[in-house]
């Protein structure tokens, strides 16, 4: 089962609507996961330019979102990454937030496992 399906099952279980998949958000998430891997950092704020997820979206012409969230995880499998996010109150709150309507997911595999980036709008 893919991570998007796992997220939507969690949302349905708390009576939140499932999220619509966004390829644009996924491309942005994947690019950021790759950047963190290649440049060796782990942070919501890009150390090379100070950008947060909102700036990353606006830079590629994504319409300014009313609500935005981002989750980062490192894990050996998609399942363990999802479980790790659900085990963290702030990450779980982002996943379950009923204000969000769309999700994009980027996953990069490296020598130390997976880097997972989720973007919510």
List the predicted regions and their residue ranges.
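Phosphate/diphosphate ligand-binding glycine-rich loop within oxidoreductases
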Residues: 1
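Functional surface patches built around histidine and acidic residues
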Residues: 4-121
